[in-house]
């Protein structure tokens, strides 16, 4: 019996060693309010050599925020890969009003986003992860296990989208500059109650990524995140990315599942209209009439 228990424990440990979770807990801050906590996080991240791109405070989620940053080394590696890899350039850090901090587990997200090219960026990804841990602390990971080997081709279940599913394409323009201008203009107009959180444009590689706040009171982030659980603070904001003249956004059934991999089917069904409603908002950002 003891041997069986020991064997089971080893098997469980082996499973966890081969699986990753999307978020890492940081150390708790002694901030008195959300604004103070955000300011402290920005200071810590800047002090670690990371560049603050923007701050996202989602409508309907008043007790949390996301600080979005970039790391020069990881950004250079992603620019070198090019194409859709640009969606992995921003790093999301979640902050709560009670001082709780969490951040994206970079290995998890970059294995999913860079896929077969992950190895090219791995040293830079690991170096950026060290900076995050030094700045914010490194507690236990959380959010739901996904086997490391499954991330490059991840989907929640049979029939659902993967990273490269065709319905990520929102609109195609004649060239890169036209595509970027359309996204910028539409975010400035606030189409479909959206707004810009950040942008990173790399004209020499013809790639760009924009963070998009979806502020619609009925179908925006506050609605569906509150239904499935707001602890995954560093899941937001969503991205629109441009490659050459094409504007893309990861489809909701993929992007949401990747950010909440332990979500039950019943919870998914409770937000079943979220992927299409979100796509409609992002289509408007892309310039779809």
Q: Can you describe what each PLM-predicted range is?
A:
Residues 63-105:
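Mid-chain, structured segments of secreted extracytoplasmic proteins
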């Amino acid at each position: 019996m003891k041997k069986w228990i020991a064997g089971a424990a080893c098997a469980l440990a082996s499973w966890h060693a081969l699986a990753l979770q999307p978020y890492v807990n940081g150390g708790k801050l002694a901030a008195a309010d959300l604004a103070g906590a955000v300011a402290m996080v920005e200071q810590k991240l800047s002090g670690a050599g990371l560049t603050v791109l923007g701050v996202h405070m989602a409508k309907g989620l008043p007790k949390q925020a996301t600080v979005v940053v970039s790391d020069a080394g990881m950004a250079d590696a992603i620019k070198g890969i090019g194409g859709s890899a640009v969606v992995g350039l921003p790093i999301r850090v979640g902050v709560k009003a009670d001082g709780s901090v969490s951040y994206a587990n970079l290995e998890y997200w970059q294995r999913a986003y860079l896929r077969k090219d992950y190895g090219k960026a791995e040293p830079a990804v690991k170096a950026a992860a060290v900076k995050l841990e030094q700045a914010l602390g490194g507690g236990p990971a959380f959010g739901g296990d996904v086997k490391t080997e499954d991330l490059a081709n991840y989907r929640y279940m049979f029939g659902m989208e993967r990273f490269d599913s065709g319905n990520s394409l929102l609109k195609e323009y004649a060239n890169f500059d036209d595509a970027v201008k359309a996204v910028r203009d539409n975010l400035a107009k606030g189409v479909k109650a959206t707004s810009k959180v950040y942008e990173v444009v790399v004209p020499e590689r013809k790639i760009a990524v924009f963070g998009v706040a979806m502020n619609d009171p009925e179908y925006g982030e506050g609605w569906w995140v509150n239904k499935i659980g707001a602890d995954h603070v560093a899941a937001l904001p969503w991205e629109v990315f441009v490659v050459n003249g094409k504007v893309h956004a990861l489809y909701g059934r993929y992007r949401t599942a990747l950010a909440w991999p332990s979500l039950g089917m019943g919870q998914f069904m409770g937000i079943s209209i979220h992927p299409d409603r979100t796509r409609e908002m992002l289509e408007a950002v892309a310039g779809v009439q």
